[in-house]
Amino acid sequence: WLAYHLSGSPFTVGMVAFASQIPVLVCAPFFGVWVDRVDSLQLVRWAQVLAMAQSAALAVFTFSGHMTVPLLLGLCFVQGFINALDWPARQALVFRLAGDRAVLDNVIALNSITFNLCRLVGPAIGGLLIAAWGPGVVFALDAVSYLAVLAALAAVRLAPPVKRLRVAHPLVELRDAVRYAWAHPTIRRVLSVVPIIGLVGFAHTVLAPVFARDLFGGDARTLGFLLSATGAGSLAAGIWLSLGRSAEGMARVVAWGALIGGTGLAVMAAHSSLALALVCYGAAGCGAALVMVPSNTILQSNVDDDKRGRVMALFTMGQSLYPVGSLLIGALAEGVGPKVAVAICGGVCIATAATFWRASGLAMAGGRHGSPP
Protein backbone atom coordinates (compact mmCIF):
# COMPACT_ATOMS: atom_id res chain seq x y z
CA TRP A 1 0.00 0.00 0.00
CA LEU A 2 2.81 2.40 0.85
CA ALA A 3 4.51 1.73 -2.50
CA TYR A 4 1.30 2.42 -4.41
CA HIS A 5 0.63 5.51 -2.29
CA LEU A 6 4.10 6.90 -3.01
CA SER A 7 4.13 6.15 -6.74
CA GLY A 8 0.63 5.39 -8.02
CA SER A 9 2.20 2.75 -10.28
CA PRO A 10 1.34 -0.99 -10.41
CA PHE A 11 4.88 -1.57 -11.70
CA THR A 12 6.33 -0.03 -8.53
CA VAL A 13 4.14 -2.35 -6.46
CA GLY A 14 5.65 -5.23 -8.40
CA MET A 15 9.15 -3.80 -7.88
CA VAL A 16 8.66 -3.71 -4.10
CA ALA A 17 7.60 -7.36 -4.09
CA PHE A 18 10.55 -8.13 -6.37
CA ALA A 19 13.03 -6.38 -4.07
CA SER A 20 11.74 -8.18 -0.98
CA GLN A 21 11.95 -11.63 -2.56
CA ILE A 22 14.79 -11.66 -5.11
CA PRO A 23 17.50 -12.11 -2.42
CA VAL A 24 15.71 -15.32 -1.38
CA LEU A 25 15.85 -16.59 -4.94
CA VAL A 26 19.56 -15.84 -5.25
CA CYS A 27 20.88 -16.47 -1.73
CA ALA A 28 18.68 -19.22 -0.26
CA PRO A 29 20.58 -22.13 -1.88
CA PHE A 30 23.86 -20.91 -0.39
CA PHE A 31 22.30 -20.35 3.02
CA GLY A 32 20.91 -23.89 2.70
CA VAL A 33 24.50 -25.16 2.66
CA TRP A 34 25.08 -23.22 5.88
CA VAL A 35 21.93 -24.67 7.46
CA ASP A 36 23.29 -28.18 6.89
CA ARG A 37 26.48 -27.23 8.75
CA VAL A 38 25.31 -25.31 11.84
CA ASP A 39 22.49 -25.18 14.38
CA SER A 40 19.26 -24.15 12.62
CA LEU A 41 17.78 -22.89 15.91
CA GLN A 42 20.55 -20.33 16.34
CA LEU A 43 20.15 -19.19 12.74
CA VAL A 44 16.42 -18.63 13.21
CA ARG A 45 17.04 -16.64 16.40
CA TRP A 46 19.51 -14.31 14.70
CA ALA A 47 17.21 -13.90 11.72
CA GLN A 48 14.46 -12.60 14.02
CA VAL A 49 16.83 -10.03 15.53
CA LEU A 50 17.71 -8.75 12.06
CA ALA A 51 14.05 -8.71 10.99
CA MET A 52 13.13 -6.65 14.06
CA ALA A 53 15.81 -4.10 13.18
CA GLN A 54 14.55 -3.90 9.58
CA SER A 55 10.95 -3.27 10.68
CA ALA A 56 12.15 -0.61 13.12
CA ALA A 57 14.00 1.14 10.28
CA LEU A 58 10.83 1.15 8.17
CA ALA A 59 8.94 2.72 11.07
CA VAL A 60 11.56 5.42 11.70
CA PHE A 61 11.77 6.56 8.07
CA THR A 62 7.99 6.50 7.65
CA PHE A 63 7.30 8.47 10.85
CA SER A 64 9.99 11.02 9.98
CA GLY A 65 8.53 11.65 6.52
CA HIS A 66 11.76 10.66 4.77
CA MET A 67 10.42 7.50 3.14
CA THR A 68 10.90 7.39 -0.63
CA VAL A 69 10.42 4.69 -3.23
CA PRO A 70 14.19 3.98 -3.56
CA LEU A 71 14.56 3.79 0.23
CA LEU A 72 11.54 1.50 0.48
CA LEU A 73 13.02 -0.74 -2.21
CA GLY A 74 16.33 -0.87 -0.33
CA LEU A 75 14.72 -1.85 2.97
CA CYS A 76 12.61 -4.46 1.20
CA PHE A 77 15.81 -5.87 -0.29
CA VAL A 78 17.25 -6.17 3.23
CA GLN A 79 14.10 -7.99 4.30
CA GLY A 80 14.57 -10.44 1.44
CA PHE A 81 18.15 -11.13 2.48
CA ILE A 82 16.99 -11.89 6.02
CA ASN A 83 14.28 -14.22 4.70
CA ALA A 84 16.86 -16.05 2.59
CA LEU A 85 18.55 -17.05 5.84
CA ASP A 86 15.41 -17.54 7.91
CA TRP A 87 13.26 -19.70 5.65
CA PRO A 88 15.60 -22.68 4.99
CA ALA A 89 16.67 -22.66 8.64
CA ARG A 90 13.04 -22.55 9.75
CA GLN A 91 12.15 -25.56 7.57
CA ALA A 92 15.02 -27.57 9.05
CA LEU A 93 13.97 -26.47 12.54
CA VAL A 94 10.38 -27.67 11.98
CA PHE A 95 11.69 -31.16 11.25
CA ARG A 96 13.84 -31.13 14.39
CA LEU A 97 10.89 -29.99 16.50
CA ALA A 98 8.67 -32.74 15.05
CA GLY A 99 11.19 -35.41 15.95
CA ASP A 100 9.22 -38.14 14.13
CA ARG A 101 8.47 -38.51 10.41
CA ALA A 102 5.13 -40.12 11.28
CA VAL A 103 3.75 -36.83 12.60
CA LEU A 104 5.64 -34.55 10.23
CA ASP A 105 2.67 -33.89 7.93
CA ASN A 106 0.53 -32.74 10.87
CA VAL A 107 3.33 -30.55 12.24
CA ILE A 108 3.83 -28.84 8.88
CA ALA A 109 0.08 -28.36 8.46
CA LEU A 110 -0.20 -26.87 11.97
CA ASN A 111 2.71 -24.57 11.20
CA SER A 112 0.81 -23.48 8.10
CA ILE A 113 -2.33 -22.85 10.18
CA THR A 114 -0.40 -20.57 12.52
CA PHE A 115 1.16 -18.68 9.64
CA ASN A 116 -2.10 -18.27 7.74
CA LEU A 117 -4.04 -17.29 10.85
CA CYS A 118 -1.67 -14.34 11.06
CA ARG A 119 -2.26 -13.67 7.36
CA LEU A 120 -5.99 -13.73 8.00
CA VAL A 121 -6.03 -11.36 10.96
CA GLY A 122 -2.96 -9.27 10.19
CA PRO A 123 -4.00 -7.59 6.91
CA ALA A 124 -7.44 -6.67 8.24
CA ILE A 125 -5.91 -5.10 11.36
CA GLY A 126 -3.15 -3.53 9.28
CA GLY A 127 -5.63 -2.02 6.85
CA LEU A 128 -7.60 -0.46 9.69
CA LEU A 129 -4.43 0.87 11.33
CA ILE A 130 -3.14 2.32 8.06
CA ALA A 131 -6.47 4.02 7.41
CA ALA A 132 -6.51 5.46 10.95
CA TRP A 133 -2.86 6.30 11.71
CA GLY A 134 -0.76 5.47 8.66
CA PRO A 135 1.73 2.71 7.78
CA GLY A 136 4.36 3.84 10.30
CA VAL A 137 2.27 2.45 13.17
CA VAL A 138 2.06 -0.92 11.44
CA PHE A 139 5.85 -1.07 10.96
CA ALA A 140 6.43 -0.12 14.61
CA LEU A 141 4.04 -2.78 15.90
CA ASP A 142 5.69 -5.34 13.64
CA ALA A 143 9.08 -4.51 15.14
CA VAL A 144 7.75 -4.87 18.69
CA SER A 145 6.08 -8.19 17.86
CA TYR A 146 9.47 -9.81 17.27
CA LEU A 147 10.15 -9.57 21.00
CA ALA A 148 7.51 -12.25 21.58
CA VAL A 149 9.02 -14.42 18.84
CA LEU A 150 12.49 -14.09 20.35
CA ALA A 151 11.15 -14.96 23.80
CA ALA A 152 9.52 -18.10 22.43
CA LEU A 153 12.69 -19.15 20.59
CA ALA A 154 14.76 -18.55 23.72
CA ALA A 155 12.61 -21.11 25.53
CA VAL A 156 13.24 -23.84 22.93
CA ARG A 157 15.69 -26.52 24.01
CA LEU A 158 16.94 -29.02 21.44
CA ALA A 159 19.82 -31.45 21.32
CA PRO A 160 22.71 -30.11 19.21
CA PRO A 161 22.54 -31.32 15.59
CA VAL A 162 24.88 -34.12 14.53
CA LYS A 163 27.96 -32.63 12.92
CA ARG A 164 28.78 -33.83 9.44
CA LEU A 165 32.10 -35.62 9.12
CA ARG A 166 32.85 -34.41 5.60
CA VAL A 167 32.36 -30.80 4.53
CA ALA A 168 33.19 -29.81 0.96
CA HIS A 169 33.31 -26.44 -0.76
CA PRO A 170 29.87 -24.74 -0.64
CA LEU A 171 29.52 -24.79 -4.43
CA VAL A 172 30.33 -28.50 -4.49
CA GLU A 173 27.77 -29.20 -1.77
CA LEU A 174 25.16 -27.15 -3.61
CA ARG A 175 25.89 -29.03 -6.84
CA ASP A 176 25.56 -32.35 -5.01
CA ALA A 177 22.18 -31.30 -3.62
CA VAL A 178 20.90 -30.36 -7.09
CA ARG A 179 22.06 -33.69 -8.50
CA TYR A 180 20.46 -35.55 -5.61
CA ALA A 181 17.15 -33.72 -6.08
CA TRP A 182 17.12 -34.37 -9.83
CA ALA A 183 17.92 -38.07 -9.38
CA HIS A 184 15.10 -38.54 -6.86
CA PRO A 185 11.83 -38.77 -8.89
CA THR A 186 9.50 -37.60 -6.12
CA ILE A 187 11.66 -34.63 -5.16
CA ARG A 188 12.23 -33.73 -8.80
CA ARG A 189 8.51 -33.70 -9.54
CA VAL A 190 7.68 -31.46 -6.60
CA LEU A 191 10.54 -29.07 -7.30
CA SER A 192 9.23 -28.74 -10.86
CA VAL A 193 5.70 -27.61 -9.97
CA VAL A 194 6.52 -25.32 -7.03
CA PRO A 195 8.46 -22.73 -9.10
CA ILE A 196 5.59 -22.39 -11.59
CA ILE A 197 3.07 -21.67 -8.84
CA GLY A 198 5.62 -19.42 -7.15
CA LEU A 199 5.92 -17.48 -10.41
CA VAL A 200 2.25 -16.93 -11.32
CA GLY A 201 0.09 -18.33 -8.51
CA PHE A 202 0.20 -15.19 -6.36
CA ALA A 203 -0.83 -12.65 -9.00
CA HIS A 204 -3.85 -11.70 -6.90
CA THR A 205 -1.68 -10.56 -4.00
CA VAL A 206 0.71 -8.61 -6.25
CA LEU A 207 -2.16 -6.66 -7.79
CA ALA A 208 -4.29 -6.42 -4.65
CA PRO A 209 -3.55 -2.68 -4.14
CA VAL A 210 -4.53 -2.02 -7.76
CA PHE A 211 -7.79 -3.97 -7.47
CA ALA A 212 -8.60 -2.41 -4.10
CA ARG A 213 -8.25 1.20 -5.23
CA ASP A 214 -8.92 1.25 -8.97
CA LEU A 215 -11.39 -1.58 -9.57
CA PHE A 216 -13.38 -1.42 -6.33
CA GLY A 217 -12.81 2.25 -5.42
CA GLY A 218 -11.64 1.30 -1.94
CA ASP A 219 -8.80 2.19 0.40
CA ALA A 220 -6.37 0.41 2.72
CA ARG A 221 -9.28 -1.32 4.45
CA THR A 222 -10.40 -2.85 1.15
CA LEU A 223 -6.85 -4.06 0.60
CA GLY A 224 -6.87 -5.59 4.07
CA PHE A 225 -10.11 -7.44 3.33
CA LEU A 226 -8.73 -8.87 0.08
CA LEU A 227 -5.53 -10.07 1.71
CA SER A 228 -7.46 -11.44 4.68
CA ALA A 229 -9.61 -13.44 2.26
CA THR A 230 -6.41 -14.95 0.89
CA GLY A 231 -5.33 -15.79 4.42
CA ALA A 232 -8.73 -17.32 5.18
CA GLY A 233 -8.45 -19.61 2.17
CA SER A 234 -4.94 -20.65 3.15
CA LEU A 235 -6.06 -21.21 6.74
CA ALA A 236 -8.93 -23.43 5.61
CA ALA A 237 -6.51 -25.47 3.52
CA GLY A 238 -4.13 -25.83 6.46
CA ILE A 239 -6.90 -27.01 8.79
CA TRP A 240 -8.06 -29.56 6.23
CA LEU A 241 -4.52 -30.85 5.75
CA SER A 242 -3.95 -31.09 9.51
CA LEU A 243 -6.80 -33.60 9.80
CA GLY A 244 -4.52 -36.21 8.29
CA ARG A 245 -3.68 -37.09 4.72
CA SER A 246 -1.72 -40.12 3.54
CA ALA A 247 1.64 -39.51 1.93
CA GLU A 248 0.36 -41.30 -1.16
CA GLY A 249 -2.41 -38.72 -1.59
CA MET A 250 -0.30 -35.60 -1.09
CA ALA A 251 0.77 -35.37 -4.74
CA ARG A 252 -2.84 -35.34 -5.91
CA VAL A 253 -3.55 -32.59 -3.38
CA VAL A 254 -0.81 -30.54 -5.05
CA ALA A 255 -2.55 -30.96 -8.42
CA TRP A 256 -5.94 -30.03 -6.97
CA GLY A 257 -4.37 -26.97 -5.34
CA ALA A 258 -3.02 -25.67 -8.65
CA LEU A 259 -6.44 -26.22 -10.23
CA ILE A 260 -8.37 -24.47 -7.44
CA GLY A 261 -5.98 -21.52 -7.36
CA GLY A 262 -5.99 -21.13 -11.14
CA THR A 263 -9.78 -21.27 -11.27
CA GLY A 264 -10.03 -18.60 -8.58
CA LEU A 265 -7.76 -16.29 -10.58
CA ALA A 266 -9.66 -16.92 -13.82
CA VAL A 267 -13.08 -16.25 -12.30
CA MET A 268 -11.83 -13.09 -10.59
CA ALA A 269 -10.59 -11.77 -13.93
CA ALA A 270 -14.04 -12.19 -15.47
CA HIS A 271 -16.04 -10.21 -12.89
CA SER A 272 -15.97 -6.85 -11.06
CA SER A 273 -17.86 -7.69 -7.87
CA LEU A 274 -16.02 -7.13 -4.59
CA ALA A 275 -17.99 -9.92 -2.90
CA LEU A 276 -17.03 -12.38 -5.64
CA ALA A 277 -13.45 -11.11 -5.58
CA LEU A 278 -13.24 -11.96 -1.87
CA VAL A 279 -14.37 -15.51 -2.67
CA CYS A 280 -11.85 -15.74 -5.51
CA TYR A 281 -9.06 -14.40 -3.29
CA GLY A 282 -9.98 -17.09 -0.78
CA ALA A 283 -9.89 -19.77 -3.49
CA ALA A 284 -6.51 -18.54 -4.73
CA GLY A 285 -5.11 -18.57 -1.20
CA CYS A 286 -6.51 -22.04 -0.60
CA GLY A 287 -5.04 -23.31 -3.85
CA ALA A 288 -1.59 -21.90 -3.13
CA ALA A 289 -1.57 -23.52 0.32
CA LEU A 290 -2.70 -26.85 -1.15
CA VAL A 291 0.34 -26.71 -3.41
CA MET A 292 2.98 -25.44 -1.00
CA VAL A 293 2.13 -27.24 2.26
CA PRO A 294 1.88 -30.79 0.78
CA SER A 295 4.97 -30.08 -1.32
CA ASN A 296 6.81 -29.20 1.88
CA THR A 297 5.58 -32.42 3.51
CA ILE A 298 6.57 -34.58 0.54
CA LEU A 299 10.07 -33.11 0.47
CA GLN A 300 10.62 -33.29 4.23
CA SER A 301 9.44 -36.92 4.24
CA ASN A 302 11.71 -37.99 1.40
CA VAL A 303 14.94 -36.04 1.75
CA ASP A 304 18.00 -37.47 3.52
CA ASP A 305 18.83 -35.68 6.76
CA ASP A 306 22.31 -34.59 5.69
CA LYS A 307 20.86 -32.79 2.65
CA ARG A 308 17.75 -31.34 4.29
CA GLY A 309 18.89 -27.73 4.51
CA ARG A 310 20.02 -27.60 0.88
CA VAL A 311 16.96 -29.35 -0.59
CA MET A 312 14.58 -27.21 1.46
CA ALA A 313 16.54 -24.18 0.25
CA LEU A 314 15.78 -25.30 -3.32
CA PHE A 315 12.12 -25.48 -2.29
CA THR A 316 12.38 -21.98 -0.83
CA MET A 317 14.03 -20.85 -4.05
CA GLY A 318 11.10 -22.22 -6.05
CA GLN A 319 8.60 -20.44 -3.83
CA SER A 320 10.62 -17.28 -4.20
CA LEU A 321 10.14 -17.00 -7.94
CA TYR A 322 7.30 -14.82 -6.64
CA PRO A 323 9.48 -11.69 -7.04
CA VAL A 324 10.18 -12.43 -10.68
CA GLY A 325 6.47 -13.08 -11.13
CA SER A 326 5.68 -9.84 -9.30
CA LEU A 327 7.83 -7.87 -11.71
CA LEU A 328 6.37 -9.59 -14.78
CA ILE A 329 2.80 -9.36 -13.51
CA GLY A 330 3.23 -5.68 -12.65
CA ALA A 331 4.58 -4.96 -16.14
CA LEU A 332 1.89 -7.12 -17.75
CA ALA A 333 -0.83 -5.32 -15.79
CA GLU A 334 0.41 -1.95 -17.01
CA GLY A 335 0.45 -3.21 -20.60
CA VAL A 336 -2.80 -5.19 -20.91
CA GLY A 337 -4.61 -4.36 -17.67
CA PRO A 338 -4.76 -6.13 -14.30
CA LYS A 339 -7.71 -8.36 -15.22
CA VAL A 340 -6.04 -9.81 -18.30
CA ALA A 341 -2.81 -10.30 -16.36
CA VAL A 342 -4.62 -12.27 -13.65
CA ALA A 343 -6.48 -14.32 -16.28
CA ILE A 344 -3.21 -15.34 -17.93
CA CYS A 345 -1.75 -16.40 -14.59
CA GLY A 346 -4.88 -18.42 -13.81
CA GLY A 347 -4.58 -20.23 -17.13
CA VAL A 348 -0.95 -21.15 -16.43
CA CYS A 349 -1.94 -22.58 -13.02
CA ILE A 350 -4.70 -24.68 -14.57
CA ALA A 351 -2.33 -25.99 -17.25
CA THR A 352 0.21 -26.85 -14.54
CA ALA A 353 -2.45 -28.79 -12.63
CA ALA A 354 -3.37 -30.77 -15.74
CA THR A 355 0.27 -31.61 -16.47
CA PHE A 356 1.13 -32.56 -12.90
CA TRP A 357 -2.03 -34.62 -12.51
CA ARG A 358 -0.83 -37.27 -14.96
CA ALA A 359 2.18 -38.08 -12.81
CA SER A 360 0.76 -37.36 -9.36
CA GLY A 361 -0.78 -40.80 -8.85
CA LEU A 362 2.65 -42.42 -9.03
CA ALA A 363 4.59 -39.61 -7.35
CA MET A 364 4.77 -41.38 -4.00
CA ALA A 365 4.36 -44.94 -5.21
CA GLY A 366 7.96 -45.92 -4.66
CA GLY A 367 8.01 -44.96 -0.98
CA ARG A 368 10.83 -42.87 0.35
CA HIS A 369 12.91 -43.34 -2.77
CA GLY A 370 10.13 -43.60 -5.33
CA SER A 371 10.74 -44.90 -8.82
CA PRO A 372 9.94 -42.94 -11.98
CA PRO A 373 6.55 -43.54 -13.63
Where are these regions (language model features)?
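Pair of pore-lining "gating" transmembrane helices in MFS-fold secondary transporters
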Residues: 1, 77, 183-202, 282
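Extracellular/periplasmic helix-loop-helix junction of adjacent transmembrane segments
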Residues: 1-22
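Transmembrane alpha-helix termini and helix-breaking/packing motifs in multi-pass membrane transporters
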Residues: 1-7, 59-64, 121-141, 214-215, ...
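Hydrophobic alpha-helical transmembrane segments
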Residues: 69-80, 106-164, 204, 221-222, ...
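Paired intracellular helix-loop junctions of major facilitator superfamily
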Residues: 96-104, 301-308
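Juxtamembrane intracellular "pre-TM" segments in multi-pass secondary transporters
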Residues: 158-192
